[in-house]
A protein has these predicted regions:
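YjeF_N-associated NAD(P)HX repair module
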Residues: 1-86
């Protein structure tokens, strides 16, 4: 299994070089990919995907779903909300 936490909810645009390499390696990994909050390379508010955005098997998001969980469904996989007391 791979845990994706390269970028977060503040991501916009395209990856920088090292982040792109990390996302490419995650996408090449065999097996389960868990994204924390938002898959890397996905804009939380718009669902826009950067080139090489991570494709997760499961996304665990915190407090509530974000627009990208609906708009970029193909990158998020199953989405579960973790209640964190906010």
């Amino acid at each position: 299994a791979v845990v994706d936490a390269v970028t977060g909810t503040g991501f916009h645009g395209q990856f920088r070089a090292n982040a792109r390499l990390a996302a490419q390696q995650i996408n090449r990994a065999q097996g389960f990919v868990l994204a924390l909050d938002v898959p890397s390379g996905i804009e939380a508010d718009t669902g826009r995907a950067a080139e090489d955005a991570v494709r997760a098997s499961l996304t665990v998001t915190f407090h509530a779903k974000k627009p990208c969980h609906r708009l970029a469904r193909q990158h998020c996989g199953e989405v579960r909300v973790a209640r964190i007391g906010i």
